[in-house]
Each structure stands twice: as C-alpha cells, then as structure tokens.
Amino acid sequence: MKSEWTIKKLSEIADFNPRESLRKGTVAKKVGMDKLQPSCRDIPFYELEAYTGGTKFRNGDTIMARITPCLENGKTAKVNILEEGEIGFGSTEYIVFRAKEGVDEDFLYYLVCSSIIREPAIKSMVGSSGRQRVQTDVVENLDIAVPSYEEQHLIGRILRNLDDKIKINSKINENLLHQLHVLYLRLFGDSVMDIPLGDVVATTSGGTPSRKHDEYYSDSSICWVKSKELLGNYIHETEEHINNLAIKQSSAKILPEHS
C-alpha cells in the first residue's frame, strides 16, 4: 500500500555543496567535467592532483553539471570512487547534492536525474549564450513529493539494479565490438585507404531552438536529437520534440531518415 507522500523543498532533503575541508596542495582524486559520461551513473575516470580549488564531495554524493551544454547532455553522476572518509574534488561547475538524514542516497540521485529536477534547472539558466549556468537557489526551492524512507529505499534499489544491468550490458557490447574489429582485420586486413570523409558522405549542422520559447516545444511531432542520445547505434525515439515553428525560426534542420 503506497504511503502518503509529503511535499518538501529539495533543500529539505539534500544539502547543497556541503562544506568539506581539503587543504590546498593536498593530493586527492579529481573528477573533471570531461570525466563524466552523459546519462551514466558511475564515474569511469579520475585523476590524482594537488587540490587548488573546486567543489568537494564524498562517496554517495550526487554531482550535477550546472553549465550548458553539460547539464542538457545528462552529465550527472553518483560518487563511488572514494574510500571511507576520503574527500574528492572537481569542477566548480558542479552542484553537489548530499542526502540528509532519513533520505536514501540512491533515491536522491535518480530524483536529480529526473525531469522533475532537470527541466526546472535548465529553464533557470542565466548568462551569456553558450556559458549559461543553473540558478542554484531555484533548484533548492523546488517542491518535491517525497515518500517514506522505506519507499525511497525500494525505488532507489530497483533503479540501481537496472543501472547495474545496463553497465553489464555495456561491457558485453564493448566486447562484441572488439570481436567485430578483430574479425574485420582478419577478413580484410589493415590495408584500408584513408580518404576525406566529405568524399563519401554529406555533412551538415544546425542549432538549438531557443529554450526561452516554450512554444517551440509544444504541439510538437519532430524528434529533437540531443547529444546524449548519440550513445547508441540507432535512434528510435527522442526525449524531446520540436515543431515546425522552431524549424522556421531557428537554424535547426530536419534530417532524412537513415541519416
């Protein structure tokens, strides 16, 4: 039986950019923005560097990019590369979320990844074009429906298990691609000519319809492909859609099927 969910501010269930002590010059694990993979929970790489500044975090914290286009691309991760009590650091362009007492850290991570947080965060962005940043106070004051801790834990566990399965499947796919490459070399050798890409394919580019115009994204039927959706080999559906008005009033382009 589903319990009653309580409406709370996000700042009531998570600490934002919690204070941590890390002396300058201390060698620690650094997670640069380039180390995060779009729509990927785990942090695949880090560097050991002397701390000179940046956001600080511990295992279990969620780090979310607050700058465009990294946030739109899905750069949000759950820290799992540190030892007990160890502090890591990273880009100043992260927002760090730490689950408060009585809040499940996996539930918080998947909440931050959801449209419940992402969409208002993206809409709150301010700044010059190409360097827009999330207004942290807007995110802190979002109203969130929060279940009991038991339900949080159940939700977090289910989604964590699915993520674990995705990770296993990704490793299987990497192995299959490696086998395909080995088989290709065995069949055709390495005597492949290098020619300019433009000699065999036509390339084009476009631009993103302004996020300030909600009407571009309403009553929409045209698939809008974001960079995070280029991770697979095929695109069958997209998270967002745009309409003909967006095409007419921006540099976005419609590409033919099988592009």
List PLM regions with ranges:
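Non-catalytic DNA-recognition/assembly elements of restriction-modification systems
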Residues: M1-S21, A145-T208, D219, K228
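DNA target-recognition domains and sequence-specific DNA-contacting regions of bacterial/archaeal
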Residues: T6-I144, G198-S259
